[in-house]
């Protein structure tokens, strides 16, 4: 129903209806650029979630219902209604990205252990879906840390999607299964773009927490030649994933000699990219002895005020991190 807004402080509109609406889909798809305050009841949000044809309104309903479910004053009956509504959206024929958003929303309000309906829903999603939605279902099932699903995770390691493989590796590590170590180390050899398989292997080993995998992790750190993304993040760059895994196992000191030698070579080569990438890796170790790196940096760049500013910033962040 079109309306016109007059240039005045307050506009009032009246609509004649046969009964009060279950929800009002105000500002359909947010085509009107504005800020609004529009209070709705739990019933209205639930109805909006199930009946609206506006994907933005449905997403807003998910967000608001998550907040309601997380409110300690919300009754168990109301929370169960919200959970059921989310499950209906997840198993619908809707667009996969929206259904994934609904699944992530459900994960925010569910506590372990999951009931049979939720577990079956996740298992069915893993069988029938792919990529993002399948990975999200594996992530959620992985939170159970249940060894029963080891074979499901192992099968998912052969998926075409790196996202699914990564989720499966992490879930497998969480089970602490005696089979996980061998499976995860073998994953490193699976061909992948820029060694994504290695990153997934390391992520899984981090969750497994088995210190007998340290030798493998050290070999990954020593490998400075394999294809990789130079993005300085454990999500995309395997040396950073390896350092994170080693730190999680409480063995960070084993990587320091490797990285310090590499850092010294980068200083000799005057390769700024290598210098600061090595600094980032060394900083992740959170070791007191890493302070010597900053002494060498300040000596190397004592005549370059711009680089000294960058060094100062790195050092400040490092010193804060080792205080924790």
Question: Predicted segment positions?
Answer:
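Short inter-helical turns and helix N-cap capping residues of alpha-solenoid HEAT/ARM repeat scaffolds
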Residues: 53-54, 94-95, 129-130, 160-161, ...
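Structural detector for internal amphipathic alpha-helices that build alpha-solenoid repeat scaffolds
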Residues: 30-34, 59-73, 97-113, 132-146, ...
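Short secondary-structure transition/capping segments
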Residues: 50, 230, 305-307
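Short solvent-exposed coil/turn linkers within tandem alpha-helical repeat scaffolds
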Residues: 92-93, 191, 249-251, 269, ...
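Terminal, low-structured helical/coil segments at or just beyond the last alpha-helical repeat
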Residues: 293-324
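Non-catalytic accessory/interaction domains
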Residues: 1-120, 124-134, 165, 321
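Amphipathic alpha-helical scaffolding segments comprising HEAT/armadillo-like alpha-solenoid repeats
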Residues: 38-48, 72-90, 112-126, 146-158, ...
